[in-house]
Design a protein with these regions (language model features):
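Active-site-proximal beta-strand elements of phosphoester/diester hydrolases
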Residues: 26-36, 128-158
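Bacterial N-terminal signal peptides
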Residues: 8-16
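N-terminal, active-site-proximal structural segment of metallo-dependent hydrolase catalytic domains
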Residues: 2-6, 19-75
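Structural recognition of the beta-strand scaffold that forms the well-ordered cores
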Residues: 28-31, 59-63, 98-99, 130-133, ...
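Active site of divalent-metal-dependent phosphoester/diester hydrolases
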Residues: 81-99, 178, 182-183, 197-256
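Catalytic metal-binding/acid-base residues of hydrolase active sites
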Residues: 35, 66, 135-137, 193-196, ...
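Structured beta-strand-rich core segments of catalytic domains in phosphoester-bond hydrolases
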Residues: 41, 59-145
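His/acidic metal-ligating clusters that form di-metal
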Residues: 160-193
């Protein structure tokens, strides 16, 4: 369901922008689902390394790591944190989420649902920040929900079927907790929401979505608890800069 080489140059949802300024310094965060550890194509891991090197992020919030983390980190010189129970082998091929950083790690951020959410503190220019990598289930999914013959209200009800909505309920308390503490410890979240963005389904864009305005729950819930979408903060016009991803430089995935 998830396209190969999904990439966001700045993290998707955060309490601060993709680039953070403190003491005249900045850092760049990248959120990326590399699809099955990058192993679905020939030389996939090497291509992952090449793309990361081109973008040169300071921090990477990775999804679908699946054992490729140590190779990527060693090739590029990043510190590496696997979102899994303490003591899990870093090359475990069943572990989804991970964090890479040029800066030193602080304390682990563990949850009861490490396949969906977890991360680490990172110390940046003397400032402690929290970084969370997350993954929401891809079901229910439709490539063109505007063509399903449903109203906005019916689409929101449809969104609650299958797995994604129930998964969000399990990890929502963690997001609420860290958002409430963000005045003391800033928090950045990046990953794979497996959902259209409500900011791309507004009144400004309804003409390309069958006149539908849909406040998609999987992204709207972050706004409701105080997070900002850093991509949309930096690129406020969703028609000129749609929040899409790509699996190669010739083909866009029009929603995710």
């Amino acid at each position: 369901m998830i396209k190969i080489f999904r990439i966001l140059f700045f993290i998707n949802i955060s309490l601060c922008c993709g680039e953070f300024y403190a003491q005249n310094e900045s850092f760049k965060v990248m959120a990326w689902n590399i699809l099955h550890g990058g192993n679905d194509i020939e030389n996939g891991q090497q291509n992952v390394v090449k793309i990361i090197k081109e973008i040169d992020p300071d921090i990477i919030l990775m999804v679908e790591t699946y054992g490729s983390g140590p190779y990527i980190a060693n090739e590029l010189g990043y510190n590496f944190h696997l979102v899994a129970s303490d003591g899990t082998s870093v090359d475990n091929k069943s572990v989804n989420l991970s964090v890479f950083s040029k800066f030193p790690f602080g304390d682990r951020i563990d949850t009861d649902h490490p396949f969906f959410l977890g991360g680490s503190e990172i110390i940046i220019h003397g400032i402690k920040m929290r970084f969370l990598s997350n993954w929401f289930h891809y079901l229910p999914w439709n490539n063109e929900p505007e063509k399903m013959g449903k109203t906005a209200e019916e689409l929101l009800e449809w969104e609650k079927t299958e797995h994604r909505y129930s998964m969000i309920q399990k990890v929502l308390p963690y997001f609420e907790k860290y958002a409430s503490q963000s005045d003391l410890i800033p928090v950045i979240v990046g990953g794979d929401m497996n959902s259209p963005s409500h900011l791309d389904w507004s009144k400004k864009t309804k003409k390309i979505h069958n006149n539908l305005v849909v406040p998609w729950y999987a992204t709207k819930i972050f706004e409701d608890i105080g997070f900002l979408d850093s991509f949309r903060e930096k690129n406020p016009n969703p028609l000129k800069k749609p929040g899409i991803t790509w699996d190669n430089k010739m083909r866009n995935d029009s929603h995710r």
